[in-house]
């Protein structure tokens, strides 16, 4: 059994992952922004922890992570504007990596997106620039850490039913540029399948030190992650 803290615990993917992790026998703490979300967290068997990641002090972040052996980052600003996007998707994510190292945590899984790279090529006036730059900088901070890290890069998220399968590959193999979903929706993937990749990646040593890009596909998730 692992003691896992999910940062961004009330997001759709995090809620599914939290439930699955509890069902797998893990002890899960879900960090949430509002006390109004506590009931939903308790309903999936996780322990709610109210923590505004954007405003949290270093001491509060340290306290939230202390006592856990695994950190899952599944938070995001959700298109709330450039300032908040950088504050959450970059700054808070980077601070969580630092806090995890101070706490002696070894395992970390960060949910990013397919195609994340500092070489994204977008100009600063592009609408997507704050998001892609913030995520890329956060990913790089995790890569340079002492943690046993995995970065997950799923494609466009949908509310489709889970398939239990994925297809691995970089952005270029799933429809080209970031505005393209591919002719057959190859870059799409259900939130439930992303949640399952979190659950499976956590206990697979094969995923440590990897940025795993994926979308919809035909390979069972654990089999794909083991490659």
Task: Give residue spans per PLM region.
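Alpha-helical substrate-binding/gating segment
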Residues: 190-227
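NAD(P)H-binding glycine-rich loop region in Rossmannoid oxidoreductase-like domains
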Residues: 30-95, 99-102, 202-206
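SDR active-site lid
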Residues: 124-129, 133, 156-191
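Conserved Rossmann-fold NAD(P)-dependent oxidoreductase catalytic core, especially the SDR/UDP-sugar
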Residues: 7, 27-29, 35, 77-87, ...
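N-terminal Rossmann NAD(P)H-binding glycine-rich loop of SDR-like oxidoreductase domains
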Residues: 4-26
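Conserved SDR Rossmann-fold cofactor-binding beta-strand/turn motif
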Residues: 32, 153-158
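Substrate-positioning beta->alpha
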Residues: 93, 134, 152, 183-200, ...
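Glycine/proline-rich active-site loop of Rossmann-fold NAD(P)-dependent oxidoreductases
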Residues: 120-122, 159-168, 201-210
């Amino acid at each position: 059994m692992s003691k896992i803290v999910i940062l961004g615990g009330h997001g759709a993917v995090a809620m599914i992952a939290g439930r699955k992790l509890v069902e797998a026998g893990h002890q899960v703490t879900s960090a949430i922004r509002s006390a109004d979300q506590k009931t939903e967290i308790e309903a999936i068997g996780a322990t709610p922890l109210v923590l505004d990641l954007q405003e949290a002090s270093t001491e509060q972040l340290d306290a939230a992570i202390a006592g856990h052996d695994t950190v899952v980052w599944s938070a995001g600003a959700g298109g709330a504007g450039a300032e908040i996007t950088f504050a959450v998707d970059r700054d808070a994510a980077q601070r969580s990596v630092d806090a995890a190292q101070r706490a002696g945590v070894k395992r970390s899984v960060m949910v990013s997106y397919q195609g994340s790279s500092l070489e994204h090529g977008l100009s600063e006036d592009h609408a997507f620039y704050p998001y892609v730059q913030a995520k890329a900088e956060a990913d790089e901070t995790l890569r340079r850490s002492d943690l046993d890290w995995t970065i997950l890069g799923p494609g466009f998220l949908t509310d489709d039913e889970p398939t239990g399968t994925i297809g691995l590959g970089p952005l270029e193999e799933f429809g080209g540029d970031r505005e393209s979903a591919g002719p057959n929706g190859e870059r799409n993937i259900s939130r439930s399948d992303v949640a399952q990749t979190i659950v499976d990646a956590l206990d697979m040593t094969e995923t440590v030190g990897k940025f795993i890009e994926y979308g919809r596909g035909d390979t069972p998730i654990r089999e794909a992650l083991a490659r």
